C-alpha cells in the first residue's frame, strides 16, 4: 500500500492510501501532490534537506520513497557523503537515468534493496558504490547492457557479496579497480563477456576473499592489467 500525506491549511497532516482512491483522483494526486523534480539540481536539493532535516523534508516533499524521479537523467554524486542515509528508494523510476557515477559515494550506512530499478539506460556506473561499506543487496536482475564504465564501481564496498553473474557486461570498456578492496566479494563471474574491456588494472586489488575461476575470459582487448590481483 502506498501511503501519502496531504497538508491541510499548512498545519494539519492527514494520511491516505493511494490504492483506496478512485482512478481519477489517483491521477490528480500524482500530478499535484507527489514531488516530481525536473532537474538533477532540484532533486539534489531535496536529498540534501532529507538528509539534514527529515521532518522539514517530509513537509515540503513527502517521503523520499515516493518521489517521482522519472524526469531525471543524471544521478551522479546524488548521495555523496550522506553517511547516515539508509532509506528505501527501490520504487524510484530511474528508467531515464544515464549517469550513476559516484551515486552512493561514501554513503556508508546505505543498505536498501535496489532490485526493482530499471537501469537499462545507464551508461556510466563508475565508482557508483565507492566506499558504500554496508551495501549488500541483490542487483543481479539489473540490465547493465548499456554500461561502458564500471571503473571502481565497488571500490571499498567491503560488505558486498551478491551474485552478479547474470550481468551483460559486453559493452563495458573499463573495469579498472572494479572490486578494489571489495574484501567480501567472492561470486562467480567467469561467464562474463569481457571482450570489450581495455582496462582491468588493479581490478581485484585487495579483494582478499575472491577465489573464482575467470580463465575463460577473452582478454584480447585488454591493454592495462597491472596489479590486477595485488594484495
Where do the protein language model's features map onto the residues?
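CRL adaptor-proximal regions
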Residues: 1-20, 31
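Negatively charged
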Residues: 16-231
Amino acid at each position: 500500500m502506498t501511503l501519502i500525506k496531504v497538508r491541510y491549511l499548512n498545519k494539519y497532516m492527514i494520511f491516505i492510501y493511494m490504492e483506496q482512491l478512485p482512478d481519477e483522483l489517483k491521477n490528480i494526486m500524482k500530478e499535484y501532490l507527489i514531488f516530481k523534480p525536473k532537474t538533477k539540481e532540484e532533486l539534489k536539493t531535496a536529498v540534501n534537506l532529507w538528509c539534514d532535516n527529515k521532518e522539514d523534508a517530509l513537509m515540503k516533499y513527502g517521503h523520499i520513497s515516493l518521489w517521482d524521479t522519472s524526469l531525471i537523467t543524471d544521478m551522479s554524486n546524488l548521495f555523496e557523503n550522506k553517511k547516515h542515509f539508509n532509506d528505501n528508494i527501490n520504487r524510484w523510476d530511474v528508467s531515464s537515468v544515464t549517469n550513476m557515477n559516484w551515486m552512493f559515494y561514501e554513503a556508508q550506512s546505505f543498505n536498501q534493496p535496489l532490485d526493482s530499478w530499471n537501469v537499462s539506460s545507464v551508461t556510466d556506473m563508475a565508482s557508483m558504490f565507492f566506499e558504500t561499506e554496508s551495501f549488500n543487496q541483490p542487483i543481479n536482475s539489473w540490465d547493465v547492457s548499456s554500461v561502458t564504465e564500471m571503473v571502481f564501481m565497488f571500490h571499498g564496498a567491503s560488505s558486498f557479496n551478491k551474485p552478479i553473474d547474470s550481468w551483460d557486461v559486453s559493452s563495458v570498456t573499463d573495469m579498472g579497480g572494479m572490486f578494489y578492496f571489495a574484501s567480501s566479494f567472492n561470486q562467480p563471474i567467469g561467464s562474463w563477456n569481457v571482450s570489450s574491456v581495455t582496462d582491468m588494472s588493479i581490478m581485484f586489488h585487495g579483494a582478499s576473499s575472491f577465489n573464482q575461476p575467470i580463465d575463460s575470459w577473452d582478454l584480447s582487448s585488454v591493454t592495462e592489467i597491472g596489479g590486477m590481483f595485488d594484495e
